[in-house]
Amino acid sequence: MAEVESFQLDHTKVLAPYVRLIGSETGPKGDVITNFDVRFVQPNANAIGMAALHTVEHSMASLIRDRIDGMIDFSPFGCQTGFHMIMWGEHSSEEIAKVIKSSLEELSSDEFGWDNVPGVAEKECGNYRNHSLFGAKEWSKKILAEGISTDPYERKVI
């Protein structure tokens, strides 16, 4: 079987929350994509509940695109501790961490309500009943309070 980078990561050594550059790849026509590990929760210590994670996913899909061009995808890890963020072009962990921090600040604000969360209707979402804005806001506040590091092994909070 092929080796998968994320399964080679020693999950006992990382210090979440952080943004980690997994790598960049160049396609056959020269296009570059960059993949990031956006880890919100310490692996094997906690997990974001599905309803909150789902609402974070939907909210961040829009909030990130408001702040930076070229986001291809922001997909949750099955372990519910964070997200893969895939971007067109080359980007640094510092640049992405600033975007993530700003997005979480807006999500956690009192002004951010259900009308700001995209894709929560039955025709827009395959599991539209499984959302929690309250949970998404609480997790966002917790992540921001802990600080987002640009290094997975040493706390370098932005």
From Swiss-Prot:
Residues annotated for Fe cation binding in this entry: H54, H58, C125
Pfam families: LuxS (PF02664)
GO biological process, one term: quorum sensing
Keyword Metal-binding (UniProt): yes
Catalysis performed (reactions): S-(5-deoxy-D-ribos-5-yl)-L-homocysteine = (S)-4,5-dihydroxypentane-2,3-dione + L-homocysteine
One GO MF term attached to the UniProt entry: S-ribosylhomocysteine lyase activity
Listed Gene3D superfamilies: S-ribosylhomocysteinase (LuxS)
Enzyme class: lyase
Keywords assigned by UniProt, alphabetized: Autoinducer synthesis, Iron, Lyase, Metal-binding, Quorum sensing
Cofactor: Fe cation
Cofactor annotation remark: Binds 1 Fe cation per subunit.
Record-listed E.C. numbers: 4.4.1.21
Similarity annotation: Belongs to the LuxS family.
Function, as annotated: Involved in the synthesis of autoinducer 2 (AI-2) which is secreted by bacteria and is used to communicate both the cell density and the metabolic potential of the environment. The regulation of gene expression in response to changes in cell density is called quorum sensing. Catalyzes the transformation of S-ribosylhomocysteine (RHC) to homocysteine (HC) and 4,5-dihydroxy-2,3-pentadione (DPD).
Subunit structure: Homodimer.
Protein's UniProt name: S-ribosylhomocysteine lyase
Organism: Lactococcus lactis subsp. cremoris (strain SK11)
Organismal lineage: Bacteria, Bacillati, Bacillota, Bacilli, Lactobacillales
